[in-house]
A protein has these predicted regions:
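Short coil turns that delineate tetratricopeptide repeat
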Residues: 39-40, 73, 104-107, 140-142, ...
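Helix-start (N-cap) detector for alpha-helical repeat units in TPR-like alpha-solenoids
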Residues: 42-43, 76-77, 109, 144-145, ...
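Register position in tetratricopeptide repeats
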Residues: 54, 88, 121-122, 156-157, ...
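Canonical positions in the second alpha-helix
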Residues: 67-68, 98-102, 135-136, 167-173, ...
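Canonical tetratricopeptide repeat
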Residues: 81, 149, 186, 220, ...
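Alpha-helical adaptor scaffolds
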Residues: 115-119, 149-217
C-alpha cells in the first residue's frame, strides 16, 4: 500500500510540474526565501507543498514537504514548514534544529523565516510576527508568500483586506504558481468578520471556482453556512470537502458538532 501511495504521489508531482508556468519552473532572482531545489522532483514537491499549505490543506502539504526531503535533504524551508505543522514533540524539535543548521549561508529573508521559531506565543503575537514579515517585505516586496503573511498580520481587518486586495490583483495578472484561491479564502473570512456577509459569500464562491478540486474551499463554504446557522447547507459543503479528501479533520469535526447540536435540539 505504501509503495502504491508513493507511486501515485510521484505521478501527481510530475503532472503538477508539467502544468506550472515558466516563472515557477525557474528559480527567480531576488531576495526571495530560498525554498527551491536543483533536484527537479524535490522542487516540484516543495512548490506543491507551498500551494497546499497556503490553501490550508495542511494534511496533504505535510506529506509533500516531508517527501521533498527524501530527494534533497538540504531543504531548510521544508524543515521550517514541517516544524510549523508539527505539535510540540521531538519531531518538531528535530525540524527546527535542522532548519537552523541548513539556513546558514542563505540570504537574509531565509534566515528571517527561521527566526519565527523565536517569536514565541504570548501578548502581541500578531504584532511581533508582523514586524518580521514587514522587514521581509521591505527586503523583497515581490515575494508572494511574504506579501501574503505581511498582509494578514496587519493590525486591523480593514488593513488586511486592503492589502490582500492589492495582492489579489497582482496574482491575477501574472499567473503566479500559488494562484489566488488562498487570497479569496482569507478575504471571505475577513469580510465575514466585518459583517460583510454577502461579500464574504461571494469570495467563497470565487474560491470554489478557482480551486474546484481542493477540499478546503468547500470546508470554508461550510463554515459560512454554519455561522449563518444554515446547518443543512453547512453539512452539504462539509461532505463535499470530505468527498475530495476524507481525512480532512476540520470537516469531520464540524459535521460531528452540527450533528451533536441537532441531536440536542430533538
Amino acid at each position: 500500500m505504501r509503495k502504491l501511495f508513493f507511486t501515485l504521489l510521484i505521478i501527481s508531482i510530475f503532472a503538477v510540474s508539467c502544468t506550472q508556468s515558466d516563472n515557477a519552473s525557474q528559480v527567480p532572482e531576488g531576495e526571495y526565501i530560498q525554498w527551491r531545489s536543483e533536484n527537479e522532483t524535490a522542487d516540484a514537491l516543495v512548490l506543491k507543498g507551498m500551494f497546499l499549505y497556503m490553501n490550508v490543506e495542511q494534511e496533504m502539504a505535510y506529506t509533500y514537504f516531508k517527501s521533498s526531503l527524501d530527494f534533497d535533504s538540504t531543504l531548510f524551508g521544508s524543515h521550517v514548514m514541517l516544524a510549523w505543522m508539527s505539535p510540540p514533540s521531538e519531531v518538531k524539535d528535530m525540524h527546527q534544529k535542522n532548519a537552523r543548521e541548513l539556513v546558514k549561508g542563505k540570504n537574509e529573508n531565509s534566515n528571517l523565516l527561521v527566526s519565527f521559531f523565536d517569536v514565541l506565543p504570548g501578548d502581541d503575537l500578531r504584532a511581533r510576527r508582523h514586524k518580521v514579515w514587514s522587514k521581509m517585505y521591505e527586503i523583497e516586496p515581490d515575494g508572494r508568500f511574504i506579501h501574503y503573511y505581511y498582509a494578514i498580520t496587519k493590525p486591523t481587518l480593514e488593513e488586511r483586506i486592503s492589502e490582500l486586495e492589492v495582492l489579489l490583483e497582482r496574482q491575477k495578472n501574472d499567473n503566479n504558481f500559488l494562484g489566488v484561491g488562498h487570497i479569496l479564502n482569507r478575504l471571505g473570512y475577513f469580510n465575514y468578520g466585518l459583517g460583510n456577509k454577502a461579500k464574504a459569500k461571494n469570495y467563497f464562491d470565487q474560491y470554489i471556482k478557482a480551486y474546484p478540486d481542493g477540499y478546503n474551499a468547500y470546508d470554508s463554504m461550510g463554515d459560512y453556512y454554519s455561522n449563518e446557522k444554515d446547518y443543512e447547507n453547512a453539512l452539504s459543503y462539509y461532505q463535499k470537502s470530505l468527498d475530495r479528501y476524507p481525512a480532512n479533520r476540520s470537516s469531520i469535526n464540524n459535521i460531528r458538532e452540527i450533528n451533536d447540536l441537532k441531536a440536542g435540539e430533538e
